[in-house]
Structures are given as structure tokens and as C-alpha cells.
């Protein structure tokens, strides 16, 4: 039996929003959060944890989610906010912004992981939620695609770092570029590999 057909402890009447983030680990750029309220009468096939989908499939689902969801919202916390608050608090901030920007107010919010942002709505953390709750899967896809597009756009301004390919993660290519060129305005100064270059 598929997980979504099993009665779940978080089944609640009314609108349900799924929330997830992308970009906690990279050395640069914002952390992006998305909140999605799906339309049960307009289902989307193939929703899954964004990390398990090909980039092409994520792109296709991104457009389908934007077209079919009752409402969705994407928000971010900047690299500057990450450095000021720390990555966990900045992630919670981005998630709260995403939920508060929804056009419709959900009855309950399900958040991927084991931490919850401070919300004025009933909420629950669901470990592995991006694989078992369709609304969280949809949110993970929106956040991931939005951030990947952001990196591709920023790459045009700073092509020497290779952001379009590694998306800001701590790859050998990125670390070599960081050592050669120093940090750009979007690098997270509080992250160790960036801080080392700035010493």
C-alpha cells in the first residue's frame, strides 16, 4: 500500500500546507523555503523528494505544481541573514515567510524534518516528510528548482566560481575558485571554508 493511501496521524480536515527548504548546505546564496497547499481535486502524479528526481523532472513538476496547486509561496533568507542569525534560524525564518505569504490560510502546516518555525498555525514536523507527504514533496521541488535557477542566474554575474554546476556546494571546483578569487558578495562568511579564505 502506498504511503499516501495510509491513514496518517496528521490527517486534518481543511487546508493542509506542506513546507520544505533547499540550500542549507551550500557555501553561498540564500536558503529557500516553499509552502504548498495542493488541490485534492487536481492531483499531480510523480511527486517525490526533489533529491530523488532528475533536474528535467523537477523542472516539469515545478511548472505543474505552480499551475495546479490551490496556492503556493516561495521565500528566502539571504546569505547576510544566514551569517547574522545562523543557518538553522535563517531556515526557520524563510519557512515562516513562505507560510505567511500563502494566499490561503491553511488549517495545519506540515514541515519536513524535526524542527518547526514559529507559526501562528497548528504545525507538525515530519521526519522524511518530503518522501511521504505530497504537499511537502511539492514544496521540496519548488524550493530546489527556484534555488537552482537563482544559482544559474547568479553564475552569469560571477562565472569564475562555477555556481551553475555545483549550486554553491563545497565541491573541489568551488573550493579551488574560492581560494583563487576570494569570496563574492553572496558567499556565507560564517561558513568555515569561506571564513578560512577571508583570514
UniProtKB/Swiss-Prot annotation:
InterPro entries found in the cross-reference section: RNase_HII, RNase_HII/HIII, RNase_HII/HIII_dom, RNaseH-like_sf, RNaseH_sf
GO MF annotations, alphabetized: manganese ion binding; RNA binding; RNA-DNA hybrid ribonuclease activity
Pfam family, one: RNase_HII
GO cellular component, one term: ribonuclease H2 complex
EC number(s) given by UniProt: 3.1.26.4
SUPFAM superfamilies: Ribonuclease H-like
Record Gene3D superfamilies: Ribonuclease H-like superfamily/Ribonuclease H
Domain RNase H type-2 span(s) in chain numbering: 14-199
Residues where a divalent metal cation binds: 20-21, 112
Keywords for this protein: Cytoplasm, Endonuclease, Hydrolase, Manganese, Metal-binding, Nuclease
Requisite cofactors: Mn(2+); Mg(2+)
Reaction catalysis annotation: Endonucleolytic cleavage to 5'-phosphomonoester
Superkingdom, taxonomy of origin: Bacteria
Primary localisation category: cytoplasm
UniProt xrefs under CDD domains: RNase_HII_bacteria_HII_like
Location(s) in or outside the cell: Cytoplasm
An example Gene Ontology biological process: mismatch repair
The record's free-text note on cofactor binding: Manganese or magnesium. Binds 1 divalent metal ion per monomer in the absence of substrate. May bind a second metal ion after substrate binding.
Function of the molecule: Endonuclease that specifically degrades the RNA of RNA-DNA hybrids.
Family assignment from sequence similarity: Belongs to the RNase HII family.
Protein name per its UniProtKB record: Ribonuclease HII
Organism ancestry: Bacteria, Pseudomonadati, Pseudomonadota, Betaproteobacteria, Burkholderiales
Gene: rnhB
Amino acid at each position: 500500500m502506498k504511503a499516501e493511501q495510509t491513514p496518517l496521524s496528521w490527517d486534518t480536515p481543511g487546508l493542509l500546507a506542506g513546507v520544505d527548504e533547499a540550500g542549507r548546505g551550500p557555501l553561498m546564496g540564500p536558503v529557500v523555503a516553499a509552502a504548498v497547499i495542493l488541490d485534492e481535486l487536481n492531483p499531480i502524479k510523480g511527486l517525490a523528494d526533489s533529491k530523488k528526481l532528475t533536474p528535467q523532472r523537477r523542472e516539469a513538476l515545478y511548472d505543474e505544481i505552480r499551475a495546479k496547486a490551490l496556492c503556493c509561496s516561495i521565500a528566502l533568507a539571504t546569505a547576510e541573514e544566514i551569517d547574522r542569525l545562523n543557518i538553522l534560524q535563517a531556515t526557520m525564518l524563510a519557512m515562516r515567510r513562505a507560510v505567511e505569504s500563502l494566499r490561503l490560510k491553511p488549517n495545519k502546516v506540515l514541515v519536513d524534518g524535526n524542527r518547526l518555525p514559529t507559526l501562528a498555525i497548528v504545525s507538525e514536523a515530519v521526519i522524511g516528510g518530503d518522501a511521504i507527504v505530497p504537499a511537502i514533496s511539492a514544496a521540496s521541488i519548488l524550493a530546489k528548482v527556484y534555488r537552482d535557477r537563482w544559482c544559474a542566474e547568479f553564475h552569469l554575474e560571477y562565472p569564475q566560481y562555477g555556481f551553475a554546476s555545483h549550486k554553491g556546494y563545497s565541491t573541489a571546483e568551488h573550493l579551488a575558485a574560492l581560494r583563487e578569487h576570494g569570496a563574492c558578495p553572496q558567499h556565507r562568511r560564517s561558513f568555515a571554508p569561506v571564513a578560512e579564505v577571508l583570514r
